Amino acid sequence: MIIPPINRPDGLGVTCIDNIKQEICTKIIDMHKDPINPKKPARVQTDDTNVIDIETRQVEQWVIADLPENDWLTRMLCTMARQANEEFFHFDICGLYERPVLLKYSALGKYDWHTDLGSGDASTRKVSIVIPLNEEFAGGELCFFDSGEMKLQIGAGDVICFPSFIPHRVKTVLSGERWSLVAWISGSSFR
């Protein structure tokens, strides 16, 4: 399923390009149990520093290790991002320079308005990918801002791609656990 970018006349909006099967979603969630994928503190970028700020971002995260047993996931993400980029964005992209990150938002977890494009490693992010992995939670909506807040009706396994400069947030999870996978396709800096 490919949905054209939503809500922008320039075509650089949010798009759903695919849906992965539930067994793949479960396999990705289970990656947090493997010690090769380290749990890391979730940080927020402020100017040129990264800090822990639970008022802005409250989530647990696991970095998916750059090891052969995880190559299938990297290949899948790169293929999907290339598809979205060729169809809609037409950015100069090179690949996945940063490792994908598995996120768990428990009750009261959230991430306030932000963009994925920043300084340091984040300065070359072009296409952001978000894949919700489950539906057993309340709240936690993925919202985008473009001349007003837009909530997407998305389900587990939907592959959401958007330019990394688009502001977005995850609203507060009211109950349950919200699992998602995020990744960023990089390229030369925007001009």
Positions of predicted regions on the chain:
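Fe(II)/2-oxoglutarate oxygenase catalytic core
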Residues: 1-159, 165-191
